[in-house]
Every structure is written in C-alpha cells, then in structure tokens.
A protein has these predicted regions:
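N-terminal, charged low-complexity regulatory/assembly segments
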Residues: 1-85
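Amphipathic interaction/junction segments at domain boundaries or subunit interfaces
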Residues: 70-168
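Short, well-structured alpha-helical interface segments that form or flank functional binding sites
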Residues: 76, 80, 181, 202
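Short, hydrophobic/π-rich interface segment
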Residues: 141-201
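Short, charged/polar, Gly/Pro-enriched secondary-structure boundary elements
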Residues: 162-164, 212-219
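Short, cationic low-complexity segments
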Residues: 184, 222-233
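C-terminal edge-of-domain segments
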Residues: 196, 202-212
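N-terminal functional module detector in eukaryotic proteins
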Residues: 206-208, 219, 225
Length: 233
C-alpha cells in the first residue's frame, strides 16, 4: 500500500518518517521471505491507521517538534511493527530501530563534552528551550530544575504520549527498547544519564545528566531491570 493511500486524519496526525519506514522494512526483510514482505508491511500500515483512529488528536501534527524522526509517531509505528511481528523480532532489534533514528544526530555532536562547563550550560539552555516548546503543546509535560554549577542537570517528564499510547494499547513490554536510547545518546556527548523510573513503570521519566567523569556516575551504577530497562541505583 502506498503511504498516500493510508487512511489517517492528516489534519491532526502525521505519517511515520521515511527513515522509520526504512528501518522497519529492513527488519521485515531480515525475518520474512520476499513473497511475504509486502503483505507484512501492509499489516503494519493498517495497524498504524487503526490505532491512530482511536488515539488523541491534540498532538499538533506537523507543527509539533516531537512528531519528527524518532519522535512520537515513529514510536507508534515501531509499536505497530512489534504488534505484527512480535513472534520473530528480538528485543535488541527493536532497540536498534530507535537507535538508528535518534543517534545519527548525536554522532554529529561528538565534539560536545558535558564535562566542560560551557557545554553543560549550553545543554541546560537547550532543555529549558525544549520545556517552553513542550508547554505550548502539553504533550510531554516537562519540568527542568534550576541550574547549579556543582550538580548534574535534572529534568523530568510527568507525561509522555508514547508511554501513554503503549499502556493504552498493550505495548508497555516493548517500551524499554524505545526508552533505552536516551542512555546511548548521552554517551555520545561524553555524558551519562542516571535514571530510576519512566512514565511506563512509574509516574515520571527522570533525567539526571552529568559528565562521564563526574563521581556522581560511580555513585549510581547502571543495571538492566527484569523488563529490559537501563536504570540506575
């Protein structure tokens, strides 16, 4: 099925991104013979359209910066792919899809070093700007703690549409594969993420961010919980 033929309300929703489609098709190619691939992809497309017809319509469509590559709607498409192909796709392959969407932008920023005050302050400003943009849409409810030189950056989401979607439609089990990319992205900036909970397994998604040389990192060792989430003690 052509993307243009997909029956979704484009006045309030957006289509999955081209990079997302490419990643999903690559996984379908990995697991299915050629004669089945088109039909499997169409199942994913139809599931996407079906669930969007039951989903909230206030996320801003193309106007909302969260709806681009690797964002809310790509996460929804990835969950639909998981729903159709869960019998063959692995957890690691699901992680790879989101990593391949998110990490290229961070790889371009390898020169950033959060251990240095200049970059740490610049990152903080980026988060405060993001909060203002979140406040305009009330999709991801974001709160950034005031900056302190001697402490890690801290912010949290108390609402996350991707998590909300996962819980509503029964995909909470695969959310760790989508959330874990936050750790990998920070590592590319000489930073570390310290997290204890997410909007799926708790009431918030917390982000404590410091340089990879900060003693705070050793004080909060990372582990994977029984559901596959990367977390910290």
């Amino acid at each position: 099925m052509k993307d243009s033929e997909l029956q979704i309300d484009r006045s309030c929703h957006v289509l999955y991104s081209k990079p997302c489609k490419k990643e999903i098709l690559a996984k379908i190619t990995l697991h299915y013979p050629e004669v089945e691939r088109e039909a499997v992809w169409e199942q994913v497309q139809l599931r996407y359209a079906e669930l969007l017809s039951k989903w909230r319509t206030d996320l801003g469509g193309k106007k909302n910066f969260h709806n681009g590559t690797g964002g809310t709607y790509d996460c929804i498409a990835i969950m639909c792919f998981y729903d159709v192909c869960r019998d063959v796709v692995t957890f690691r392959e699901m992680e790879e899809i989101e990593e391949n969407l998110i990490l290229p932008s961070f790889r371009k920023l390898r020169f950033v070093d959060i251990n240095k005050p200049f970059w740490k302050k610049l990152m903080y400003r980026a988060f405060t700007t993001a909060q203002k943009r979140c406040d305009a849409w009330h999709d991801y409810e974001m709160d950034v703690t005031p900056y302190e030189n001697s402490k890690p950056i801290y912010y949290e989401f108390t609402a996350c549409p991707a998590a909300e979607f996962a819980k509503r439609f029964g995909f909470a089990d695969i959310m760790p594969a989508l959330c874990n990319v936050d750790y990998a992205s920070m590592e590319l900036l000489h930073a570390r993420l310290v997290r204890t909970t997410t909007c799926v397994n708790g009431c918030k998604c917390d982000y404590t961010i410091c340089g990879d040389k900060d003693p705070y990192v050793k004080e909060h060792p990372e582990y994977r919980d029984e559901n596959g989430y990367r977390r910290n003690k």
